[in-house]
A protein has these predicted regions:
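Soluble extracytoplasmic regions of secretory-pathway and membrane proteins
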Residues: 2-230
Length: 230
């Protein structure tokens, strides 16, 4: 009995030891040079490389205000307000040259999910950060893959099934220039110790409607994607 108890204890102790050592060798205090080298510093000319923008392109709306506008807009939609809620995404992106926030919907509760799961989430919201206009984009086919879904269509489980060896950062809800909804899921790695020096290797794009996935290395990610590095 003692031997049987000793083996699990030793395994647990070994795991704790590895975690502690991995954390220590990644401390910023002793690996400052390695963290410094994560970024390549290049000399440039700010005036020539950064374009000026006009006043009508300057975002005037913060996330909290966008959330209030989104909830208010959903409350005006009699066919949706009883079944759905606005999700907490509100991702800031550049859409057709305009600063906007986009967010998906989510089911109000388990019963509403059960009643609507076959058709998916019917729309997403676009909030213009300059004009404060809120647009409800209704979809021909509903969004079926989200962070608020259940079982196999939950985004986290879906990614784990398709990319079991990848480590992902937090996904971001975005739309391409044609208004198609996607989840941008950065693939990350730790380059300093076991847990430090997080770097991005690429990103998996998941079509939120069809579930189609594609992986892109950092240099090949589509230009419309805004959220790869957090």
């Amino acid at each position: 009995v003692k031997k049987q108890c000793k083996i699990p204890f030793l395994l647990a102790a070994a795991m704790v030891l590895v975690a502690v050592v991995g954390s220590v060798i990644g401390w910023k205090l002793i690996r400052a040079g390695s963290y410094r080298d994560l970024l390549t510093v290049e000399t440039g000319d700010f005036a020539s490389e950064v374009q000026e923008i006009s006043f009508d392109q300057i975002p005037m709306l913060d996330r909290d205000s966008a959330t209030k506008l989104g909830n208010r807009k959903l409350g005006e939609l009699a066919d949706m307000v009883s079944q759905f809620e606005v999700d907490d995404d509100y991702t800031q992106i550049n859409y057709k040259g305009r600063p906007v926030r986009v967010t998906a919907l989510r089911y109000g509760d388990w019963i509403k999910w059960f009643n609507n799961r076959s058709s998916g989430l019917p729309a997403y919201l676009i909030i213009d950060m300059v004009t404060q206009n809120v647009e409800v984009v209704r979809l021909d086919s509903g969004i079926r893959y989200t962070t608020a879904e259940h079982f196999g269509r939950n985004l986290g489980r879906y990614l784990r099934f398709h990319y079991p060896t990848y480590i992902f950062d937090d996904p971001a809800f975005e739309i391409d220039e044609d208004g198609n909804p996607y989840w941008v899921c950065p693939r990350i790695t730790n380059t300093i110790g076991l847990f430090g020096g997080t770097d991005v290797l690429g990103a998996v794009l998941v079509n939120a409607v069809t579930g189609e996935t594609a992986y892109y290395e950092v240099g090949a990610i589509p230009t419309w994607v805004d959220h790869v590095y957090n």
